[in-house]
Amino acid sequence: MSMLKDPSSKYRAFPTIDIPDRTWPSKTITEAPIWCSSDLRDGNQSLIEPMDAVKKLRFWKTLVAVGVKEIEASFPAASQTDFDFVRTLIEDNHIPEDTTIQVLTQGREDLIARTFESLRGAKKAIVHLYNATSPSFRRIVFNQDKEGIKAIAVNAAKLFVKYAAQQPETQWTFEYSPETFSATELEFAKEVCDAVIEVWNPTPEHKMILNLPATVECATPNIYADQIEWFGRHINRRDSVIISLHTHNDRGTGVAATELGLMAGADRVEGCLFGNGERTGNVDLVTVALNMYTQGLDPQLDFSDIDGVRKVVEECNQIQVHPRHPYVGDLVHTAFSGSHQDAIRKGFTQQKDDALWEVPYLPIDPADIGRSYEAVIRVNSQSGKGGIAYLLEQEYDISLPRRMQIEFSQVVQAETDRVGLEMTAPQIYALLQREYLQANTPYALVSHRLQEENGNSFVEVEVSGKGQGETNLHWKGKGNGALEALVAGLPIGVEIMDYNEHAIGAGTNAKAAAYIELRVNGERPVHGVGIDENITTASFKALFSALNRSLSQQEAKAA
């Protein structure tokens, strides 16, 4: 079987929502929502190997540390393991004063009774009721009409009131989800929710939660936003209801649907860290939160150690985070492209600590989430001079002049093409050493002597010359400065085109780096590098580096 030529014979477009005066498109997110993690329930039930109690407790503590204030811990009536985990959290005092445990149940009385029993002794708790309301579930799964589906919700809501009254020491919050809300007729979803509201009788001081799931994402995110805005306009007692979002990622737009839903008036978001969950996953709370952060809004969640959070999530879920996952993937702050690297390097150079963040290609400062800058630029055959220069600057305090960056990038690219692999900073530095710092044939500097007299420099150098056997060469020169004097003493026509120098490090261990661009015998300019504790020695080494490289290239050209 293959894809249909006419998919409309099998699939139908989702109907649009008629709201000609919709307001959400012109709104922005101005404050963080109430966050609820469903990692330990929705996320856990989707794992090949669900978490054991040890992993669950580790995950719980991570969520608390991040700052999630409402955590759906389990489906206590589903298994003894889930029930016992809730008891452990309560009896061993793992629930901070500012954090509320949430549990899920269906509408049967035995399940509801077991759920409330699991929460005995909790200071406060959210009990979450759900039943599916969409046409396909009514027809295919439950064989119920609308009145039957509404009756399930209303009867269960009454049981919530009954069992909560038996444990008055707990501060209860009730939550209702018309599961498959986004595929349910809006008028019917409102009808069911209004009926539950009448039973629970919330007030502005003691609100209930209406959670509106895109249980299966079946339309573009703007339609979900329309559904949320319509619902918020029409639901009874809006001032006594917290509207919560619970999106999935079947179409790949869970984050967008959540953000537009918040613009449409929602107050709360349920999801999982890094988007774990059934099928393609729940909305990723981390991405939504850090999207807010990069817009200058405090998300009220702390991902200062995002890699530490990722480690816990990966080990507990036994699922690796994709290297391209927003904000946390191994490669999301990494540039291989030459033009990208050049822009990033220039951005870092100009970025000031107290200024607005404006580094190209990096929507967030990696340091804000505990990332180093080491992996920002990596070098392969697609890389250019900017990335190579950046790595040398960051790792070795080597600042190549611009024209030398171009020359050396060709050397690096030839090497990456040859080996077909990425090059690390140590490998690039080793290539710099081999190509420039160790370019000591045919002439290698052995020693030099410099004298200053009447504004002139007098230089005498000793070099080991190719084919000279045990006898070294001695050249003398005079000029306006050490380099000019050395050039004057060379038996070869040399023209200095450019010279740069800078310190490497500071204090007693500082060294000097010198860079020379010169033309030898009228040939094309080449570069040389010298590093030494003494700046004059470094400049002489740079000159011989360039001289030797030029002569070697001329020899190879003539061969």
Swiss-Prot record:
Q: Which CDD domains match?
A: DRE_TIM_LeuA
Provide the Pyruvate carboxyltransferase domain boundaries. 33-307
Which residue ranges are recorded for the region named Regulatory domain?
A: 439-559
The entry lists its GO molecular-function terms as:
2-isopropylmalate synthase activity; acetyl-CoA C-acetyltransferase activity; magnesium ion binding
Q: Which InterPro entries match?
A: 2-isopropylmalate_synth_dimer (IPR013709), AIPM/Hcit_synth_CS (IPR002034), Aldolase_TIM (IPR013785), IPM_Synthase (IPR005668), LeuA-like_post-cat (IPR054692), LeuA_allosteric_dom_sf (IPR036230), LeuA_N_DRE-TIM (IPR039371), PYR_CT (IPR000891)
Catalysed conversion reaction? 3-methyl-2-oxobutanoate + acetyl-CoA + H2O = (2S)-2-isopropylmalate + CoA + H(+)
- Give the record's pathway: Amino-acid biosynthesis; L-leucine biosynthesis; L-leucine from 3-methyl-2-oxobutanoate: step 1/4
**Protein's name according to its UniProt entry:** 2-isopropylmalate synthase
Q: Which family does it belong to?
A: Belongs to the alpha-IPM synthase/homocitrate synthase family. LeuA type 2 subfamily.
**Which keywords fit this entry according to its UniProt record?**
Amino-acid biosynthesis, Branched-chain amino acid biosynthesis, Cytoplasm, Leucine biosynthesis, Magnesium, Metal-binding, Transferase
Entry function: Catalyzes the condensation of the acetyl group of acetyl-CoA with 3-methyl-2-oxobutanoate (2-ketoisovalerate) to form 3-carboxy-3-hydroxy-4-methylpentanoate (2-isopropylmalate).
- Gene Ontology terms: cellular component: cytoplasm
Q: Which gene encodes it?
A: leuA
What GO biological process term is on the record, naming one?
A: L-leucine biosynthetic process
Query: Do the record's keywords include Magnesium?
Result: yes
Q: Which NCBIfam families match?
A: leuA_yeast, PRK03739.1
